[in-house]
Design a protein with these regions (language model features):
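N-proximal low-complexity "stem/linker" segments adjacent to membrane-targeting elements
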Residues: 1-29
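Cell-envelope/extracellular polymer assembly enzymes that use nucleotide-activated donors
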Residues: 8-11, 41, 163
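Short, acidic, metal-binding catalytic loop of nucleotide-sugar glycosyltransferases
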Residues: 28-39
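Glycine-rich, basic loop-to-helix element that forms the pyrophosphate-binding segment
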Residues: 66-83
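Conserved nucleotide-sugar donor-binding
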Residues: 84-86, 135-150
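Short beta-strand-to-loop acidic/aromatic patch adjacent to the donor-nucleotide binding site
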Residues: 85-94
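Conserved donor NDP-sugar-binding/catalytic core segment of glycosyltransferases
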Residues: 100-129
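Acidic donor-binding loop at a coil-to-helix junction in glycosyltransferase catalytic cores
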Residues: 157-164
Length: 275
């Protein structure tokens, strides 16, 4: 068990645009973390000019911009530059993390690791957990020094994440972390919640790119009165008790239970094999 003084400082990086309802669950996930307050931060970059997000908390920094980035890669680079830590968690605005997630990060992201994938994570579809399994590139953790070494995120839209991850893999230090299923901590939220770039395919010549498609979707919702504009005070909350859902799912499907918090478990269970 690591002492607080030995724990790494972790920066949770979140980029967002017009998805307050999802973002509030993401922020709440951060606030629930069982991790020293002086060892973590949440950086939120909002480039939806019609909204100014507000939330007063010493560990949460929100940057509201008056312009929209032309590529997601540029936005990711801007947000990464703001991160104080060398260990950076991708903290998507439409995903959820269990309270022991940063303890998992500290446990598995050792000094020789530059990029970490979760195998397993929690696959959440619609309004239910459907599997505890490999979740691809969702919730990756990477090292800022490695990000700098490869030149940052590529200046791309749809598909930028694959390019970035492939470059990090080539750089070295790839890890597939294998927490016990009962202690999986990153929820990949898929289906029935919001516009999801992963389901929209790659950009194609002559057609609107990912930024343009998402902007049009948000504008349509705004015109329907479904999106607030101006100053928006965030009210972090979870719509469901995701920890309880996870405990019930794991016990019913696998017959196991989470009997202790992650930071009480001293043995690392990791794999460097591609799932």
């Amino acid at each position: 068990m690591q002492q607080p003084s030995e724990l790494p400082f972790i920066s949770c990086k979140c980029i967002t645009y017009g998805r307050v309802d999802m973002l509030e669950e993401s922020v709440n996930s951060f606030l629930k973390q069982d991790y020293p307050a002086d060892k973590c931060e949440l950086i939120i970059v909002n480039d939806y000019p019609l909204q100014k997000l507000k939330f007063d908390h010493p560990q949460v920094k929100i940057v509201n911009l008056d312009y929209t980035f032309s590529t997601i890669g540029e936005k990711e680079n801007y947000a990464t530059e703001l991160c104080q830590g060398d260990v950076i968690c991708q903290w998507d605005d439409d995903d959820v993390a269990a309270p022991w997630h940063l303890q998992n990060v500290a446990k598995y992201f050792t000094d020789d690791v530059n990029i970490l994938h979760w195998n397993p994570g929690v696959f959440y579809n619609g309004n239910a957990i459907t599997d505890i399994t490999w979740i691809g590139n969702s919730g990756i953790v990477f090292r800022k020094s490695a990000w700098k070494a490869i030149g940052g995120h590529p200046i791309e839209n749809a598909g930028y994440d694959m390019t970035f991850i492939e470059r990090l893999h080539k750089h070295g230090g790839r890890l597939f972390a294998e927490p016990p299923k009962a202690e999986a901590s990153w929820f990949y939220m898929w289906g029935g919640r919001s516009y999801h770039m992963s389901g929209q395919g790659h950009d194609k010549p002559g057609q609107p790119n990912a930024i343009q498609r998402h902007s049009a979707h948000v504008e349509n919702l705004r015109q329907q009165g479904k999106i607030s504009t101006g100053d928006v005070e965030l009210k972090p909350h979870w719509k469901y008790d995701y920890v309880q859902m996870l405990d019930i799912f794991v016990k019913s499907k696998y017959g196991t239970s989470r009997t202790t918090t992650v930071h009480d478990i001293s043995q690392k269970q990791v794999s460097r094999q591609i799932p």
